[in-house]
Amino acid sequence: MSEGTIQPQEQHKKKVFISYSRQDYLDSSNKPIDDSTVGTIVSALKGNGVDVWLDVSANYTGEYFSKVLAANILDSDAVVFLSSAKSNVSEWVSKEISFSIDNKKTIIPVKLDDTKYNLDFALGLSGIEAVEYYLGEEAGINKLLKSSNILIH
């Protein structure tokens, strides 16, 4: 390296935790469903340089599972909440979103349908503009990518 040459600093790769219902993404064998909305969103984020963490394994149990989720939420720059009829009745999604709110994580709600939020965390999400993905896939992806670029520090 010659004198005076400035090396680029390694850029922090943005990391998001995906809070979702497995029923929206995985089949009964825990394999991703082809062409699922969740898969499309995950691929779009990854394709734009975002490190994505979502639980697709059913190998965790009880207390250990809670610790894995909590550690990954805390390690993320933001939480992308994939709101759907199924995720809004999920006990685990409720815990993830409530934990994220309690720990002041940036939350980006993405509405896969027009289901109202679970009352366990609806108040914590009030005032946060949701990406209304169900109104149009391309516009939804673009808004999510714009939101993640602006909100994730």
Residue ranges and their predicted role:
Residues 1-81, 101-106, 112-115, 139-153:
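Conserved N-terminal substructure of TIR/SEFIR domains
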Residues 14-16, 126-129:
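Short amphipathic alpha-helical segments
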Residues 27, 89, 133:
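Generic anion/oxyanion-binding catalytic loop in active/binding sites
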Residues 61, 85-105, 117-119:
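Conserved TIR/SEFIR loop-to-helix hotspot centered on a Trp-containing motif
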Residues 67-71, 96-97, 123-126:
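Short low-complexity, flexible loop/linker segments enriched in glycine and/or proline
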Residues 115-128:
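Glycine-rich, charge-decorated loop segments at or immediately adjacent to ligand/cofactor-binding or catalytic sites
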Residues 127-144:
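Output/docking surface of receiver
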